[in-house]
């Protein structure tokens, strides 16, 4: 299984001949190396409804006839736009032909903001994502604060690789993320959701250097890990 980081919270997974992308915020993302029109996928996994995570989902999904796996309200909202979806909710798991997906709790918001019409549409609860394929589990925390049930996520799952936000302001910052690392007990941790905008500027190398109970690794944009 090959896992690639493409800036902000964009993660691509290649496994068993399938390509899965998590939170494909590409257009308007100054930290990505991908262009929406070039992305070929079989499935898209979404953690929540904010624009910097849903991103180019509709265009990519329609062009590839890809399924979008998302929290129920967000899946419904995208389905109304002609996207093929599979709705789920926190605590639920489903076995797809590309791997197993389970949604976990995340402490954040989830909405679609229409700046032009000044409206906000509720898109359900935010989620973290546990993805399992080839007998290995990846945890993508989505956008979240630190919460104590991360201990439960770590206790109940043998997590090979975790992507955790460290940007602060909108999510947990480096100090809280370091505690999350201990609770999740992943073998390797990669920071995400930082330096895309001035308000979430952080030093990811400083973060991973302080980790003592796992392998911390900063992935440059476009860099991959093979599990």
Curated annotation (Swiss-Prot):
SMART domains from the UniProt entry: Lactamase_B
Family annotation (Pfam families): Lactamase_B_2
Keywords: Hydrolase
GO molecular function, one term: hydrolase activity
Similarity section: Belongs to the UPF0173 family.
Protein name: UPF0173 metal-dependent hydrolase Bcer98_3294
Lineage, uppermost ranks: Bacteria, Bacillati, Bacillota, Bacilli, Bacillales
